[in-house]
């Protein structure tokens, strides 16, 4: 396992669409482990593979309920609406309000290659949407309704 460099805004890999994983092998599992370690070290709640320069459809998320590893995630259902603050390890110092579904259902493969589904609400729904957007070359700044000023960012940190 290794800590990977998180690509920053301006790096063209962040704007590219990731390719599906066709075989789950030791290389893919190592990437997932590296992604989790990198996410935790950087105090993130999610990380997509292209954020570490790997154009494969891999996502790790932990919103405080344990690590989720998703291979080839796809949103199959969404409902409701929520607006909330988002930041990104690839866009340090920027926080914006983004409209997302309140609830989503995501189909994905686990590390054994079994098809799974997960339902997420609130923060988990937001994280799933944010990371899957990354896999499609979309950043939260593309969807932000507005950006928070320094005082507002401090208030968000305190919550």
Curated annotation (Swiss-Prot):
Binding-site residues for Fe cation, renumbered to this chain: 88, 130, 134
Pfam families recorded: Pep_deformylase
Annotated catalytic residues: 131
UniProt keyword annotation of Nucleotidyltransferase present: no
GO molecular function, a single term: peptide deformylase activity
Repressor listed as a keyword: no
UniProt cofactor note: Binds 1 Fe(2+) ion.
Gene3D superfamilies: Peptide deformylase (3.90.45.10)
Reactions listed under catalytic activity: N-terminal N-formyl-L-methionyl-[peptide] + H2O = N-terminal L-methionyl-[peptide] + formate
Family, similarity comment: Belongs to the polypeptide deformylase family.
Role: Removes the formyl group from the N-terminal Met of newly synthesized proteins. Requires at least a dipeptide for an efficient rate of reaction. N-terminal L-methionine is a prerequisite for activity but the enzyme has broad specificity at other positions.
NCBIfam families documented for this protein: pept_deformyl, PRK00150.1-3
Entries under PANTHER family matching the protein: PEPTIDE DEFORMYLASE
Protein name (database record): Peptide deformylase
Source organism of this protein record: Thermoanaerobacter pseudethanolicus (strain ATCC 33223 / 39E) (Clostridium thermohydrosulfuricum)
Gene name for this UniProt entry: def
